[in-house]
Structures are given as structure tokens and as C-alpha cells.
């Protein structure tokens, strides 16, 4: 379910039982409360008998390895980002969702009416992840190709028109198109009627793949100016062959990330994070991260440049369509002290559910 780092497994093998147990207790206390754990309290929690002085010696070794640190003099210890990654890769036990939890996820996601646009389903998935994780639920979807339902060309000026494409779910795409010189309003109507009669029921990529055949049909039934207009319309709707970019980011539960923040600097860093997430390049990067390995991926703090300033973590997994193509990703954004072992199976199951519903 989660990618493991073999190098971290190697480090784990160098720790003896007491070092591993002390490290695990420090991290688990941090994830539960956010508080540092001191040697005196640690010695009481350990299953083996160790004095506070012996615990401090082990903690010193763990500090030398870069796994823990002291936030200030005489304080207990907290995990570093390296320590958190080490814990996730080598120590974390990922449980399974209960039947009740799986049912709850399905019920919440399926609240969206199947006759409604896919955006309703995505919004429900994002809201569900936010509510169950107490973080921000994230859904990224690639741009879907609408099935052509209706086309219209509306003249705006002697040399410009608005090309309107209506898809099968009544989604509308508008493009400004340069008109062939001398084309009449009657020819605009003729071109639109041709598209609606002969090309409706197909997606733009499907039309693009048989463009030469379409051109031959156009030449056989339309005059030269109307032919030119139809070909221009197909070209401007199609875009370039590699222009399939993530089109939508849905985030729910942003307010959850404000809990526990102190000072305007922390809030400003979080605001910058969400501003960055709205940028197209960031969406592409997030989707690439989800695609970079099988199953759920975990990115802690500065491991991902998008989250380095805000100190946030991302747990993300891709979902697929009926052709097994990755068409989006679901995930959770939260502080570095997320409950990783609980959220990982939640994200994994949601991605599986989204894959089933996208088929």
C-alpha cells in the first residue's frame, strides 16, 4: 500500500531493541499530542527497565543520527523531519479499515447523484476525507473529454466568432475563433448544422484521431469557407496533442489546518500554500507525485517543495478510469503530526472507490 524506503530499513537494522523502542515512543507521543517526551517519562513508559540516565544516552545517539532533536534546553525530544520519514518507512504499522469505516466512506462519497456532473462526486470525496482525517481533503481531476452534443458559431465581429461546444453533461466550452474572410452568417449556420448532424456523439480526441476522414466528409458536403470554419473549430477545441492537463482542484476542510497555528507567519505560510496549489503547474506536479509509484505516497514537509514553507504533509493516491489510465488523485493535507497509520488506508480505499465509480 505504501512505498517503503530500503535505505531507512537499513538504518532500522542498526538500532537495537531499546533504541528502537525509545525512538518509537518519542514519535508516537509527538503524533498524539505534539509534545516533546523527556527521559524521566520515557523510562516509565518503556517495557524494559532503564534509568533516565540510560535513556538520555540512547537519546543522544538518536540525535547524532539526526532522528530526534531538543526544541530547547532541558526539554524532551521531538522527531526531526528525517525521523518522521524514518518512522513512516520502517516502523509504522498500517492497519485495515473496519467494515463500518468502509461503509461510511462509500455512503458519503455516493451521496452525489449519479446523474449529476462528476464534480459533485469529487466534492463529496474531498469533504469526506477532510471530515475523517481532520485535515484538508484534496481531489485532483484531469480534464475529461466531453462527448460532443451541440455546436454553435456566434459572430462577434466581421472576422471573429464565438465557437460554443456543449457536452453530454451540459458542460459548455467557449472559444474565440478567427473567421475565414468573407464568410456569411448563413455559412456559420451551415457549418454548425454539419457538425451537429455528422460529428455529435464523439469526443474531440476521437475526432482528432480521424481528422483526415472528417476533412474528406466536410469537403464533400460543404463549400470552401464552411469547410475552413469546421476545421478551425475542431483545431481550436482540440488544442495540441499533449495538452491533457489537470483541470480541477477541489479542497475541503482548509479551516482544519488553522487549528493549533500560532502567529501570523504560520497563517501566511498556509495561505501561500493554497495560493500555490491553485496554479496549473502545481496541479501537474501533484498529479505527477501521485503517479510516481504504486499505491499511496507520503510526502513530509520539505520533501515536496510545495509544502516546504508551510511545514505540511501530503498523503496522496491516484485513481483510474476503465482503461486503467490515471485520471486523478485523492489525498489529505495536514500538519506533519498526522495520524499516518489511520489516514493511509483511508486514502487508499477512497482511491479504489473513485476508480470503481469512474469506470
Swiss-Prot record:
Keywords, comma-separated and alphabetical: Repressor, Stress response, Transcription, Transcription regulation
Membership in a protein family: Belongs to the HrcA family.
Residue stretches spanning the membrane: none
Gene3D superfamilies, per the entry: 3.30.450.40, Heat-inducible transcription repressor hrca homolog, domain 3, Winged helix-like DNA-binding domain superfamily/Winged helix DNA-binding domain
An annotated GO BP: negative regulation of DNA-templated transcription
SUPFAM superfamilies: GAF domain-like, Winged helix' DNA-binding domain
Known function: Negative regulator of class I heat shock genes (grpE-dnaK-dnaJ and groELS operons). Prevents heat-shock induction of these operons.
Gene for this chain: hrcA
Protein name: Heat-inducible transcription repressor HrcA
Gene Ontology MF annotations: DNA binding
Native organism: Sinorhizobium fredii (strain NBRC 101917 / NGR234)
